[in-house]
Amino acid sequence: MDYKDLLFCPLDLPTPPVIDYSKFKVWYNEQLDFNKKHNVTALLADGKQEYPWEVSWALWWNTYDKPNPWICNFEKTFPELVEYFKLYPFKQFKSISFLDQKESRDVYLHTDPDNRWGMRFYLFNGLGEKLYFVKSKERLTTRLRTMVDNKYTDLWEHSQKEKLYAKFPEKRCAWMLNSLDAFHGIEKNPSPMGNRVTCVLNGDYDYKKLFELLERSVKKYKQYSIVY
């Protein structure tokens, strides 16, 4: 298949390591001050009441090329996650973040900056199948940004107006998404924070490994895949 058509698919990778949420929150609070001082994205997100997540960064664009790129000893606190990251098809990680969906909040329709193929996994997921996609009205060559000049782009009006819900082989798993030819959102989280935490991995791809992973994944999880 043409992998440009692939909008969503679970990935043929092991189940992510299990970690303790309270331990994660301790690290979250430690990295908060660092990122507020050094991470422009964190500053922009800080204090936004409408922002549906609490975001933390294990590695960011201004740390990835340092001798030790990990923020606030992430690699010592969660070595099992650092090893898990290595299974993804990147030559160089440039940003690794965690999105902790706020209680009683849905996630509005949006796109992500990794464009064509985005790598994700659920660190925690108590919501089940709440992630949905809508196809773009027509095939796009550039991503429709969620916000332009502090104004929300009504992505629904640029879509085919049909919600396609992602299904997963297990609650906690690795998966990919396409933010060029589809937009996505998440239904409301009725439970306390920590019920749904997504890891977002960005960087420079090893395309040979990427396409090998996509080929294995589509073959294994064809019944779960969403295509344009």
Regions found by a protein language model. Name each.
Residues M1, P14-D20, K66-P67, K86-S95, ...:
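Generic structural signal for short, solvent-exposed loop/turn connectors between secondary structure elements
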Residues M1-F90:
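Non-heme Fe(II)/2-oxoglutarate
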Residues D5-L7, N115-M119, M193-V197:
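Residues at beta-strand starts and edge strands
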Residues F8-C9, D46, W61, F133, ...:
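Generic detector of low-complexity/intrinsically disordered segments
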Residues F24-Y28, N35, F74, F78-L81, ...:
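Extended hydrophobic/Leu-rich segments
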Residues D46, L99-Q101, F124, N178-S179, ...:
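Structured loops at beta-to-helix junctions and adjacent beta-edge loops in soluble globular domains
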Residues F90-A174:
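Catalytic core of non-heme Fe(II) oxygenases with the double-stranded beta-helix
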Residues R143-Y228:
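Catalytic core of Fe(II)/2-oxoglutarate
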